[in-house]
């Protein structure tokens, strides 16, 4: 390796480290975050990195995801990109699709070179689209915060190439237009002006569920359909307990207070944990299937709700049950609940 290359890498690492240390000194330990597009070996410990100055079109949006997944396979736990692209100004169509992708990334920001990326600069629908995905991300924060802690403590990235989550599924080896957001959510951004979403669901012990519609789909196959701007292929892995927070107004709130635990197609056992901003575990839940019975044990000092997705219940002990569409909602929950199907 040449001396000039070594010097360049040291400069990149040292500059990111220096800025991070200044932020840490100013904001306090565990509060420093920088946005960097430069990186080299060792730069993984100074997040967040973003994709740089891409063009504002579908091709660049797609390439941004491809590069981001490659970066995270290199040990970078967090990654961001400029919603709507950076160079030039995107069409309203591209912007609205990028909003969905951007808000379902580990970090999200509106940024560009020649124009403001605020949604009302595009059209009224863009405001509605951005608002809906901001609210979704706010509700997902108990899950996303746990995912972030996993990235920090274990080195498993928050946005995962499919091959990382499904090492034994050869179909996943080359998939670079979809990803796992944490353990349980599969995201497939839309990269065309027809609104066509196409994605592959790996084979699982159970059935995948569309987050928005509740539609169930078997793994081991490809799926295609057209999506509105307020939708995106967002599939929930079977055997999942997904915590949804009680706030749509911002990312910081009491994640355990009045949380809703959504239970998706538990075949054997599934669990979830909620952590506060100081990384203390403040709630946990375990759901077990025993023949025709679901047994739920939750450790929480705050009130919570359980939503059994696509599940009908005949008898419940330890909670009050009501039917909403195809789901069963459990309220006034005790720490131990038994549900007979």
Model feature map: region roles:
Residues 20-33, 39-49, 60-63, 67, ...:
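Catalytic core of carbohydrate-active enzymes
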């Amino acid at each position: 390796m040449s001396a000039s290359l070594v010097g360049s890498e040291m400069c990149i690492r040292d500059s990111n480290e220096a800025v991070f240390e200044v932020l840490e000194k100013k904001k306090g330990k565990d509060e420093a975050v920088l946005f960097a597009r430069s990186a080299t070996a060792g730069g993984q410990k100074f997040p967040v990195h973003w994709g740089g100055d891409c063009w504002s079109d579908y091709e660049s949006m797609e390439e941004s995801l491809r590069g981001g997944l490659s970066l995270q396979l290199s040990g970078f736990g967090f990654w961001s990109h400029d919603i709507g692209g950076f160079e030039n100004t995107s069409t309203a169509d591209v912007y609205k699709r990028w909003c969905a992708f951007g808000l379902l990334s580990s970090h999200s920001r509106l940024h560009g070179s020649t124009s403001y990326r605020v949604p009302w600069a595009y059209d009224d629908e863009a405001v509605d689209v951005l608002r809906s995905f901001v609210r979704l991300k706010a509700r997902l924060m108990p899950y996303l915060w746990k995912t972030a802690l996993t990235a920090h403590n274990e080195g498993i990235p928050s946005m995962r190439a499919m091959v990382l989550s499904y090492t034994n599924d050869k179909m996943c080896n080359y998939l670079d237009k979809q990803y796992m957001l944490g353990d349980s959510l599969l995201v497939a951004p839309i990269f065309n002006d027809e609104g066509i979403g196409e994605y592959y669901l790996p084979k699982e012990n159970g059935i995948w569920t569309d987050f928005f519609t509740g539609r169930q789909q078997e793994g081991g196959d490809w799926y295609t359909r057209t999506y509105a701007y307020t939708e995106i292929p967002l599939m929930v892995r079977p055997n999942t307990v997904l915590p949804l927070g009680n706030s749509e107004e911002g990312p910081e709130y009491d994640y355990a207070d009045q949380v809703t635990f959504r239970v998706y197609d538990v075949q054997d056992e599934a669990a979830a944990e909620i952590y506060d901003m100081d990384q203390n575990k403040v709630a946990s839940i375990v759901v077990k299937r025993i023949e025709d019975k679901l047994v739920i044990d939750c450790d929480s000092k705050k009130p919570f709700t359980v939503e059994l997705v696509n599940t009908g219940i005949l008898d419940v002990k330890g909670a009050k049950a009501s039917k909403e569409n195809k789901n069963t909602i459990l309220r006034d929950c005790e720490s131990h609940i038994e549900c007979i199907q």
